[in-house]
Amino acid sequence: MATRVYMHTLGCPKNRVDSEVMLGTLAEAGYRLVQDPAKAEVIVVNTCGFIESAKEESVEAIVELADQKREGRCRKLVVTGCLVQRHAEELARELPEVDHFLGTGAYQDVARIVSDAQAKRLVVPDPDFVHSAATPRVNSLPSHTAYLKIAEGCDNACAFCIIPKLRGGQRSRPIDDLVAEAAALAAQGTVELSLVAQDLTAYGQDLPGKVRLHHLLPELAKVDGLRWIRLHYAYPRDVPDALVAAMADEPKIVKYLDMPLQHSSDRLLRAMKRGRDSVFLRDLLARLRARIPGLALRTALIVGLPGETEADFEDLLRFVEEQRFERLGVFEYSPEEGTPAAEMADQVPDALKRERRDRIMAVQQGISRAHQQAMIGRRLEVLVEGRAEETEHLLAGRHAQQAPEIDGLTYVNDGVAYPGEIVTVEITDAAEYDLVGRVVARDPSRAARPLPAAPRPPPPRRKGGLNVLG
């Protein structure tokens, strides 16, 4: 009987792709993949080491899953990822129950190390691995959606960020290799492709021939079967007109852009070493919205960088009120050893960081509510995910401006559809992050296939002020 392996992934979508590559490598080597750690002889934990809270979550997961080795059928516990790349020796001392530690440059070796009784306990080479279309990969999301990692590493030197030390420098994948992987995913049923990288807009700067992201996008759009292509982790420093035009003119590129801006105060932007000032950021946002009407912008901000004054924070708060981002997340600055920001004077107290985060999110909640209310009455294309977790009486899906895993959902309380089907939904209700609607049109080729309607719902209930059952 094949040895069973369970993968536990923490962190970002880029980490998820790494886990999928490891799963593919293990499956090709004959291992059987399972969803329950209690059934696995091998457990792999792919960690995140970006900020302190992520490191704590990773260690907690390792300790919890180590119970399976003491009390269950697990015979080998393997820990991989960014936390290992950064703290391998310390982890090895503190976690004797772990059999192997693999850094970010050793993902391709996971099957060999798991099967080799003589393999080293610490395998932490330079972080120079990048997978290709030929690398085995198992998509861990529903087959209709997938991530495509177009590059690995980062050449930026943001003062607060440890990622270049964990992932190495920028390494872009060739266009033909990315198209081949996208086509393989589409052949498996993927209709939504989310492009990710540490710095998406730096794509191609390390490749010969002056290849850039705006050259890649039209080639991906030619892949049969793909319907939606979305962009994540765009660095604002390098968004040329050609890229904006490609996003505006190609129908498969959804009107959604994830672009972390981090701050608006010029003093803080200089301290962060972001390379652009607030005038540039405002001009860029205006250019994007003018050229791509209806664009939904997601951004990430940092509060509490050392030296952030109340005036700096008020500048950021005004920026949020002014720009009215459709989606926004806020991180409390986490001092990371080995980064310039960790050595800066005037560290901000944790309580003040939390207060500033909460103030921004309170403002954003009202902005988000207004954006959502404006959706009522509109007809949107919705990618159906399946039955809602809350109740079988609802379908759950996402419209083109709701990214997987990080944004809200669109609940369907009237009509039927298949997981992976894109249907037209009329929006009937809205809350801060989620929408409710009814199916008003389906692709005739899909609608012809029989699917039982959901059971009639019980009396209406509300979710955060949202009447999800109509």
Curated annotation (Swiss-Prot):
All copies of domain Radical SAM core, residue ranges: 140-370
Tagged with keyword Chaperone: no
PROSITE patterns recorded: MTTASE_N, MTTASE_RADICAL, RADICAL_SAM, TRAM
Cofactor: [4Fe-4S] cluster
E.C. number(s) listed in UniProt: 2.8.4.4
Cellular component terms (Gene Ontology): cytosol
UniProt keyword annotation of Ribonucleoprotein present: no
Disordered, as annotated region: 444-470
Reactions catalysed according to its record: L-aspartate(89)-[ribosomal protein uS12]-hydrogen + (sulfur carrier)-SH + AH2 + 2 S-adenosyl-L-methionine = 3-methylsulfanyl-L-aspartate(89)-[ribosomal protein uS12]-hydrogen + (sulfur carrier)-H + 5'-deoxyadenosine + L-methionine + A + S-adenosyl-L-homocysteine + 2 H(+)
Binding-site residues for [4Fe-4S] cluster 1, renumbered to this chain: 12, 48, 82
SUPFAM superfamilies xrefs: Radical SAM enzymes
GO MF assignments: 4 iron, 4 sulfur cluster binding; aspartic acid methylthiotransferase activity; metal ion binding; protein methylthiotransferase activity
This protein's UniProt keywords: 4Fe-4S, Cytoplasm, Iron, Iron-sulfur, Metal-binding, S-adenosyl-L-methionine, Transferase
Comment on bound cofactor: Binds 2 [4Fe-4S] clusters. One cluster is coordinated with 3 cysteines and an exchangeable S-adenosyl-L-methionine.
NCBIfam families: 30S ribosomal protein S12 methylthiotransferase RimO, MiaB/RimO family radical SAM methylthiotransferase
Task performed by this protein: Catalyzes the methylthiolation of an aspartic acid residue of ribosomal protein uS12.
Protein name as it appears in the record: Ribosomal protein uS12 methylthiotransferase RimO
Higher taxonomy: Bacteria, Pseudomonadati, Myxococcota, Myxococcia, Myxococcales
